[in-house]
Each structure stands twice: as structure tokens, then as C-alpha cells.
Amino acid sequence: MKKVKRLFLVLAAVALTACNSNDDEVEAGIEIPGITITDDVDCCSAEEALQVYKFLQTVKIVPELSTEIDGKYNVFAYTHNGSFHNGYNELFFVATKKATGNYIKNFELTNITPTMHMVKMDKFHSTPTGPAADSFDNGILAVKRSWVSFIMNTSEAGSWTLSYDALVLGKEGKVEKKNIVVNALPDGQAWLKSFKVGDDVYFLSLVNPNDWKTGSNTIKAYISKKSNPITTPYALATETFTVDIDPRMPDMGNHTSPDNTPLVKQQDGSYQGTINLTMTGLWRIHFTVKDTKGNIVAGGEEELSSLYWDVTI
């Protein structure tokens, strides 16, 4: 009887261990549509996969920029609304194993290359482009992020293609010169501005104007430098600037607002500052670009600056 009891306890312990192991794999019964969770170390755990899945519900796929690699993997591209527009656009990428649908944690996405064909002149140029895609959130490593800021929209005058290289678990793949449509934004939403310093042309891309509300807001932008040759994506400028901002309300006596701080260069290459918007309506944000010595290199003083963004909140 004692032997039987001991055997029962051993079997119970084994069963409990097996149940706990299974729970570790699927993490208390998490189920995700189209995804099978296994003990594959290349892929996300159930909890990680759920985070990725939830994030992907907030963006939309760009089918023409998705691809298959080596018959085993898929790479999918997304933007916030599944399309592109003038100015700053974020691009997100995930890679999956076809066998399970699960998200691969580590893969590389490089050489993002947007190219415009100017039809009448039969010439080509690129546009400001972010660096190689990288995990934008430490909690969601399987989602890689980069960006493109389009200087022109698609029209009879010209069309856009986009290419990139992918490396997934040692296997190479690419999307090459896929046609994309870049839509024009409504009047008053020209959030990509250019300026010259000597013979060099720079582009200032405003990132987050749709997120602003009354009160204090973080203002974020990127400064890119036109490449030579111009068919090469315009990388972030290595030079350092300071961007003073002066927000005004042209429909309300051109009054300003207090407690704004300049955009200064961050470790990730972006420029960030603070803008304080005291009420709803149209704001014209004049900006003055200064070099490291404080000399004005573009724009002008305060509301006299010829460079500005219009933002309505």
C-alpha cells in the first residue's frame, strides 16, 4: 500500500510538472488567432506574441511591401493606415515563421530605399529616410520600426517605389522597387520643410502634430541632409542644430504662448522640445534654425521667420 501511495505521489508530481511546463509555453491558455505557440527559441512566448498581435491591430498592412523568404518565413510591412502621405510616415515590420505563424524576435531590416521617378525629366531622386529598422519598444522586440518622409506626393509628374533588404535567421530576402502611392495631405498640413546652409539642403520633418492637445506637448522632428547622389536615401544630418520655435495664432491677433523650449538633438538622432498651446484652433509655428555657435542659418527671428508649420488642434 505504501509503495502504491509513493507511486501515486510520483505520478502526480510528474503530471503537475507537465501541466506547469505546458502553462509556461502557452502562458495560462493564451490563444492568438493564426499563431501556434511552441518552445521555439527564435520566436515569441505567448505573452510576447500577444503584445505584438495587439500592436498590429493598431496599424494596417501594406501588402505590396510584404514578402516571403526561403519558403519558410514571411516579412510583413505596416503603416498607421496602410498607406503613405506627404511628410513623415512610420514603417513597422514583423517576420513570422510560416509553419506556426509566430513572430520572430530577431531579424534585420536594412537599406530602406524610396525612389521617385520624375517622368518629364526622366530623373530619379530619393527622400529623407530613417536608419535601419530597429525595435522601437523594448517590450515588443519582434516589431521593427523605421520611417520615410516623402518630399512629394504621387502625381502625373512622378511616381514612387520602395525597396528594402531583410535578413531572417540567416536567410536573405528583399523587396525591390515596389510601386507605392504617396497621397497629398490637405492644405495646411505641410509638415516637411527644407532649408539651405551654404550649398547643402536640409529637410525638417515634423513627427507628431496629430497627437497634440491644449497644454504642454513634446514636439519632435528629424533633420535630414540631401544626399549626393540624390538617388541615395537622405540620411539624418550629422551636423547639430538648435531649432527655436515661436507658436502664433494668426486668427487670434497673432498672439503667442509661454513656456516653449527649443528642439535640441537627442541621442537617437531626433530633435525634441516643448510646445505649449493655450487654446484650440490654428497655430502657426515659426521656427529658427541655429548652428552650434548660435548663428541663425535658416528662418528668421520669431514670427518673422519664413519657415513654419501650420497645425490645427
Model-derived features with residue positions:
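Sec-dependent signal peptide recognition
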Residues: 3-10
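Short flexible loop/turn segments that cap and initiate beta-strands
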Residues: 89, 97-132, 224-261, 299-305
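Short acidic/polar inter-strand loop motif in beta-rich domains
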Residues: 99-100, 167-175, 282, 290-304
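Surface-exposed beta-loop interaction hotspot
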Residues: 153-219
